[in-house]
Amino acid sequence: MNTPAIASKAAAVVAIAIAASVLSPSANAQPALRPFDPDPFVGVWLHDVARVDCASGTALVTFKAMQMIHHGGTLSDTNSAAPTTRGPGFGDWERTGDNQYAIKLRYARYFADGNLDGYTVVRGNTALATDGNSLTNSSRVEIRDASDALVVTACARTTGTRFK
């Protein structure tokens, strides 16, 4: 038996197999990388908000607000209330149809002395304009006390533009 010849042939076969696997395009192929393509709702939005009479739609109070819609379905929210009377809002969003979204968020409210007044929960439906640079929203607002019990519900209407 010629052991060195067999070992030499085995080494050659292994070398050819390694070379074939390294040089073969399919052996090193990686999945095609897709460019990052966020939902068109993602971004920073400047809002004009009106708390409205739920029955008539008449504006009762207006204020400015800002939301950041994050990739992946979360959002951050703030408004023009004094920072000592309202905490930041956090929530989530989901796409419900073509340019249609459902949002919900929650923030804490404080008395002027710094004590907790309660919480506000907002649930709304947002329609994104076809150009992706403006939106409208209609929301139901839950005013809750410091123990998180529902006190009253209200309504809000929002128009927004993308911050550029």
Regions found by a protein language model. Name each.
Residues 138-164:
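Edge beta-strand at a domain terminus
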